[in-house]
Structures are given as structure tokens and as C-alpha cells.
Amino acid sequence: KRPDITLYVYGSNMPDDIKEFECDNIRMVGFAEHLDDVFHNHRVFVAPLLSGAGIKGKVLESMAYGLPTVLTDVAAEGTGLTHGISTLIAEKAEEWVDGIIKLYDDEKLWQKFAENQSTLVKSNFSFEGGKAAFKEIFASVGLFTTR
């Protein structure tokens, strides 16, 4: 649909048969030495995870960088992200394409997701957020300290 958009695929130990998908607008990069460069040089983070437990680290990293996401339900698990408010959830191929294009073209939506994701990760997954949560837990059982 959009030959002006290039999909970059990252991942360590990428199998050779996956690399065969590379074409004009798909780049099979594989392992990325510096993730900072990856998150700063792309407009949308895509995580088509179909299985896995727990919070996905790369999803949280993209949130911390304020990089809007298109995810599966599995990739969004445990992050607090909500479809249409802080991310786009996609399952079918057409939903992925539409979601990526929407975030490329709609600057207001891109900004909204970037801000909402950044706020979410700071309040729920930062050191300060964790410290505040533990302080509240300790206070609730009478172990409050002023330090």
C-alpha cells in the first residue's frame, strides 16, 4: 500500500529463512548493537508477538522513548496500554497495515500515543513509581518510614 514506508525487522539470532523476506521496503536487520539508535530513528514500533508471558521489555523501552506502538494483545499484556488511547492492537494483516499507516500519517494521533505511553511508563515502571508504590504498601501495614 505504501512503498514510501520501510519496515525494519530487528532481532538477535534471526534465522536465514526469515532474512529471505527482505525486499525494497523490508530490511531484515537482525541484531541491533545500540537500541538507542533504533528507537530514535524510527516512527512506529511494531511487536507482532503471538506467545510469551510477562511484560515485554522492548515494548516498555519503546514506551519510554515515546515511540508509538502497534501490538498484538500478547505484546500489550501487563503494560497498561489501551487500544485507541495509547496503542493500536492488531491481529489481522490488514489491521497491521492500517495501524502503521495511521501512525505515519496522523500527527495528532502519533503525539497522543507518544505522550500517553511515556506518561504510563513513567508512572508505572520507573524507579520513582516503584518507590512510591512500595512506600504505600509499607505504610498500609504499619512499616512506614520517612526515608
Walk through the language-model features, giving the residues of each.
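Nucleotide-activated donor-binding/catalytic signature segment of Leloir-type glycosyltransferases, i.e.
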Residues: R2-D37
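Short glycine/proline-enriched, acidic/aromatic patches that form the donor-sugar handling elements
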Residues: D16-I18, L35-D36, A53-I55, A75-G80
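Acidic donor-binding loop of glycosyltransferase active sites
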Residues: H40-G54, Y65-P68
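Conserved acidic donor-binding loop of glycosyltransferase catalytic domains
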Residues: I55, T72-D73, A90-E91
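Short hydrophobic beta-strand element within catalytic cores of glycosyltransferases
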Residues: K58-S62, P68-T72
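Conserved acidic donor-binding segment of nucleotide-sugar-dependent glycosyltransferases
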Residues: H83-E94, K102-E107
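A charged, aromatic-enriched C-terminal amphipathic alpha-helix characteristic of glycosyltransferases
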Residues: D105-S140
